[in-house]
Amino acid sequence: MDTKIIVNHALRALLYEVTVNPKPGLVDPLSAGPHPDMNAFMFIDSALSLAPYFNACAAAGVAYTAVDLTGLFKQIRGIGVQAEQTMFAATKGVNTHKGAVFSLGVLVTAAAYQLQHPDVDLATIVRTMLAGLTANDFNDLNTKDPTTLTAGERQYLTYGIKGIRGEAEAGYPTVMQVALPALRRSRGTINQRLLDTLMAIVQATVDTNLVKRAHDPHVIDWVHDQAHRYFDLGGSRSEAGMAFLRELNQIFVDHNYSLGGSADLLILTIFIGLQTDILA
């Protein structure tokens, strides 16, 4: 494997995620969900605009020789800010992949670094790269102007939810311990397998995008129950399970709910699945 393959897998992960359908509360080819300003074509444009960014991440990872891997993260974080602007230019200001710019950029960098250090597992590389991330990012939030806080910062202050920063700093345990095993167990078409993997993620995670939309952390208990029901109905390989997803999407549209955090974790899962031939 080389960096070109890693970048290819990153782009495929973004494109696979938007193609999977029907996804409740998310954009797919059949529905924009609660995102009237988005469509699948916009996600394709957004994904392809990020190719130079992933190439830069991979190049940084494979060339990095210093012992302190937090320096590698600092390198790509600056590149990521530029990539966000490229994405916004491609989508005319719509936030399609900002979460993936961070999370998938980290994984692409770690996977490229691993090419030179095959004895170190991916999660360990990520944890070492991101050591101290939440402490650094959330330090002194109480002294900041509340109007300048991001949604993630507000949720941390209000509910103590660390969100994607906490997930990333821990080496993406939801991906490694929940989503990838679910993908390995899954059967059927790629679409069926990825739907079941998505709902396994939904069942296990605190989706900060959903909390943001609902303005209530208790919505997480509700969505976990919905994911349980989906699997009780037979999941993606049953007519009842698929009908339930379509009904659930309408509920999400009616309440303006989104599962953007879960979608980002699915992207990471697809990427690793392609890297490891779980998705052939």
Swiss-Prot record:
E.C. code: 2.4.2.52
Naturally occurring in which organism (per UniProt): Lactiplantibacillus plantarum (strain ATCC BAA-793 / NCIMB 8826 / WCFS1) (Lactobacillus plantarum)
Record InterPro entries: CitG, TriPribosyl-deP-CoA_syn_CitG
Keyword Nucleotide-binding belongs to the record: yes
GO BP annotations, alphabetical order: prosthetic group biosynthetic process
Record GO terms (molecular function): ATP binding; triphosphoribosyl-dephospho-CoA synthase activity
KW Zinc (keyword) present: no
Identification of the protein by name: Probable 2-(5''-triphosphoribosyl)-3'-dephosphocoenzyme-A synthase
Enzyme class: transferase
Keywords: ATP-binding, Nucleotide-binding, Transferase
